[in-house]
């Protein structure tokens, strides 16, 4: 598997994105603001075919959802969106933010009308299955802060000199003994593919198979620090690298990124379990 070729340098699908461009904000409903990015761009580079070796979802949380009710009174809510990974496109985050802003001065008669509109528009942009949940203020208390389950590997006392992405940190990183364990790190950091702005995240790796050397795993995760790719693409890359180099029999990779523009993205990929309930982390 090659990781050196840049699949994005000549990608026409990235040329017209509003991301990284000066933008005028629209306050009235405009679904054309949504922009999709083909998942195929990254999946070709890591040799993923239409028969994906995992299932999963991209879990979005929107903290700045607002519209007007039938009488023109503002309403606020928290948005949760689950986007199935078999969709043709992922949703570009700045366009998602601009689209949500376009609801701010738009009247809806009830909550179902908002939900139906969001479901239709996001599904059309992604060309795939989307599930929308709208959390009203009276239910905000269920949005508790939690931690990713597992053993955090961040306290390992290692010295780092190289911050370039390098999957070969995982070479010869396993023992003969088979284990079932869950490891976490809060040190995941990559950069936006278009703007190079930092993306901060926490990641959970749950696997069954040969025991992975935790120091080598941490070095690998830290090597994303100057890597330019979207959140969803980074998680799929981690999944494929762990499968290739560590020979995991069962594997889940779940990352929760800090929010930008009122939105956070939390990609979940697994070949043996379903996505957990979405609970924000302290940094979100």
UniProtKB/Swiss-Prot annotation:
SUPFAM superfamilies: Tetrahydrobiopterin biosynthesis enzymes-like (SSF55620). One of its GO terms (cellular component) is cytoplasm. One of its GO terms (molecular function) is preQ1 synthase activity. It is found in: Cytoplasm. The keyword Ligase does not apply. Keywords: Cytoplasm, NADP, Oxidoreductase, Queuosine biosynthesis. GO terms for biological process: queuosine biosynthetic process; tRNA modification. NADPH binds at residues 93-94, 260-261. It catalyses: 7-aminomethyl-7-carbaguanine + 2 NADP(+) = 7-cyano-7-deazaguanine + 2 NADPH + 3 H(+). InterPro entries: GTP-CH-I_C/QueF (IPR043133), NADPH_dep_7-cyano-7-deazaG_red (IPR050084), QueF (IPR029500), QueF_N (IPR029139), QueF_type2 (IPR016428). Its EC number is 1.7.1.13. Pathway: tRNA modification; tRNA-queuosine biosynthesis. Substrate binds at residues 91-93, 231-232. Pfam families: QueF, QueF_N. Its main location: cytoplasm. The active site is at residues 192, 199. Catalyzes the NADPH-dependent reduction of 7-cyano-7-deazaguanine (preQ0) to 7-aminomethyl-7-deazaguanine (preQ1). Belongs to the GTP cyclohydrolase I family. QueF type 2 subfamily. Homodimer. This is NADPH-dependent 7-cyano-7-deazaguanine reductase.
